[in-house]
Amino acid sequence: MLGQVVTLILLLLLKVYQGKGCQGSADHVVSISGVPLQLQPNSIQTKVDSIAWKKLLPSQNGFHHILKWENGSLPSNTSNDRFSFIVKNLSLLIKAAQQQDSGLYCLEVTSISGKVQTATFQVFVFESLLPDKVEKPRLQGQGKILDRGRCQVALSCLVSRDGNVSYAWYRGSKLIQTAGNLTYLDEEVDINGTHTYTCNVSNPVSWESHTLNLTQDCQNAHQEFRFWPFLVIIVILSALFLGTLACFCVWRRKRKEKQSETSPKEFLTIYEDVKDLKTRRNHEQEQTFPGGGSTIYSMIQSQSSAPTSQEPAYTLYSLIQPSRKSGSRKRNHSPSFNSTIYEVIGKSQPKAQNPARLSRKELENFDVYS
């Protein structure tokens, strides 16, 4: 109702002010708010030197310059940025017309010769009774892996001005949901299926849509899910390997300890250097474990002169059993202990002696090996 009143007032003003600035009949232009509006004059058959677009302001009882243009220069906009000038056809463009843009517009074209031509437009901008144009929706979503090769998809679709709008959901090209107020979608799909979703928002005059592909989310989750069994297998094999290695090390250590306990001790070798026949000492050598033995080396330097090079040396070997009688030299009483006695002498004709009849002094001249 208010728009009709404004229109009637403008028509009356047009009759009053017509002829005071712009001559001729006015072209009527009707538009709705929120859409671009272009005022284009008929073809001008003269060489243009300058132009001026003006709008009638009833409050000021005259015309107000919107923009000016001279040949070879840029347009000079004396109004706001909602107006622009198209040089090619001398048109005035209102980017988004509003109700306050209604009124009388006049175009003055000045030729090079100074002749002025005019064109008049009566503009009526009405508020649309229909909803505004739908904006592009904001579609967000994510995929989550589930058991048995399933993927859970969660989506949300919103617009800034959602009054009197309807929502429709598509998976690929298939319509899956037609509920008008359903801004959220939650469903389970197969991992190997289609994961491209489209949200369509519409009202009686326009519609917009937004598409989102969640294939990568579901595939990445599926690959992560398939990786877990391999990871578990690797961990189990590593644990088995480490356990086997630890058992082997323990078994080897116990085996070495057992071998060290059962293995016989090494033989003990005693070296004795006797330089003086008068030196007397008791030789004690005891076998501490069965089956063992010891070797006694006695280096004896006799007081007699060493054999000369003319006298050949002979070696006497005798196998004796040590006496059980205690004496100055103690021996092992084990039956398995045997002694080998040999003597290096410098006699020309060695004479074997009975080891059993040798005196202690004579026995000291022998080397004993066991």
UniProtKB/Swiss-Prot annotation:
Residues 1-21 form the signal peptide. Pfam families: Receptor_2B4. GO terms for biological process: adaptive immune response; immune response; natural killer cell activation; natural killer cell activation involved in immune response; positive regulation of granzyme B production; positive regulation of inositol phosphate biosynthetic process; positive regulation of interleukin-8 production; positive regulation of type II interferon production. A motif (ITSM 2) lies at residues 295-300. Glycans are attached at residues 71, 77, 89, 164, 181, 192, 200, 213. Residues 251-370 are cytoplasmic. A motif (ITSM 4) lies at residues 340-345. This is Natural killer cell receptor 2B4. It comes from Homo sapiens.
